[in-house]
Swiss-Prot record:
Lineage of producing organism: Eukaryota, Fungi, Dikarya, Ascomycota, Saccharomycotina
Sequence similarity: Belongs to the INA17 family.
Transit sequence range: 1-28
Mitochondrial matrix compartment residues: 29-97
Keyword Hydrolase applies: no
Segments forming a coiled coil: 121-149
Native source species: Candida glabrata (strain ATCC 2001 / BCRC 20586 / JCM 3761 / NBRC 0622 / NRRL Y-65 / CBS 138)
GO process terms (BP): mitochondrial proton-transporting ATP synthase complex assembly
Regions that span the bilayer: 98-118
Domain of life: Eukaryota
Job of this protein: Component of the INA complex (INAC) that promotes the biogenesis of mitochondrial F(1)F(0)-ATP synthase. INAC facilitates the assembly of the peripheral stalk and promotes the assembly of the catalytic F(1)-domain with the membrane-embedded F(0)-domain.
Localization of this protein: Mitochondrion inner membrane
Protein name stated in the entry: Inner membrane assembly complex subunit 17
Length: 164
């Protein structure tokens, strides 16, 4: 900011002096050696801008402006690079809450699916056992009918263990 203010002040001083000069004045005053003027600071050391080539002034101002623009661009690039690096470094904190939410939702879905699976397995097993009970009941009824219609059991008073 200070460099920009310094340049704008320098430009203002140079342009004020350049407006007051006429072309004939610039051509007639040979006391300034244009080859010695290399920077804007050299221009500020002069008492007047009489005899200084306007193209030289313009070139020096453009060089300094380009220098400051380059510095500003470098600063901007550095700040953008730092910002990009900061954004690329993803902290673990950003993922903990979504991870917990995902785990809770996944476990809820799993438990719900498992409950449905158990219920279906229970119903299937219940149907199988009901068929088994029905078949055993029919077998029992058939055996009881045969026993009722069959020969009467002998009234053997001997104990079963005596046959051994």
């Amino acid at each position: 900011m200070i460099k920009t203010a310094k340049i704008s002040t320098l430009r203002l001083a140079i342009t004020r002096n350049a407006r007051n000069l006429s072309f004939t004045t610039l051509v007639r005053s040979p006391e300034v050696d244009n080859s010695k003027i290399k920077t804007l600071e050299d221009l500020t050391r002069l008492e007047t801008l009489e005899g200084v080539d306007p193209e030289l002034i313009k070139r020096l101002i453009n060089e300094k402006t380009q220098e400051f623009n380059t510095q500003d661009e470098l600063k901007l690039l550095k700040s953008m690079q730092m910002e990009q690096d900061r954004l690329n470094e993803v902290p673990l904190k950003r993922f903990t809450r979504p991870l917990w939410i995902f785990i809770l939702m996944a476990s809820t879905f799993y438990l719900g699916a498992h409950l449905v699976w158990w219920k279906l397995a229970y119903e299937k097993k219940e149907v199988e056992l009901k068929h088994k009970v029905d078949s055993l009941e029919t077998t029992l009824k058939d055996v009881m009918k045969e026993k009722a219609t069959g020969p009467t059991p002998c009234n053997n008073k001997k104990s079963w263990y005596k046959f051994w």
